[in-house]
Amino acid sequence: KTPSDSLALVEIPRRRLDPAKLRRSLVLALDDVQNPGNLGTIVRLADWFGIGDVVCSEATADCFNPKVVQATMGAILRVRVHYCDLEAYLAAERAAGTPIYGTFLEGDDIYRTQLSPTGIVLMGNEGRGVTPACAAQVTRKLFIPPYPAERHATESLNVAMATGIVCAEFRRQASAGR
């Protein structure tokens, strides 16, 4: 592949995670997302859907990996990416009453579920999904149904693709006033 003919020299920001501030917005949480292309695409999706913060487990790919930076197409400069003990963060947010949504194969149909305009959307690892420790903090399990409903040819969606679908539905409902 031909590399981009652009170069940027930027200081890597040191960001402090402020959970109380994030409670007023929609936040993406990533549980051990390993593929740099997926992480970059998710950061780009966050930017597209007006999500300013992505909270990652410590085992998630490095957001400043060159493949991640390239996949963000500049969104890495606008979206704040935080790394922390994700299980502890989710447990504290659950205790604070923050809605925590997670994507699972056995959740509620996302298109038939009323979604909050604020809260945390938890997305899991490419191969294992959401870890049991993080899944225990989820307050609402969501499922993206296949179409038609009886079609089950594909086992699951790529994490970045699923994130795009979930973000679109959250924003659709928020703009519709649901």
Set out the residue ranges of the language-model regions.
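Short, surface-exposed amphipathic charged segments that create phosphate/polyanion-binding patches used
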Residues: 1-4, 95-99, 158
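Extended, non-globular alpha-helical segments
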Residues: 1-21
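RNA substrate-binding interface of SAM-dependent RNA methyltransferases
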Residues: 14-107
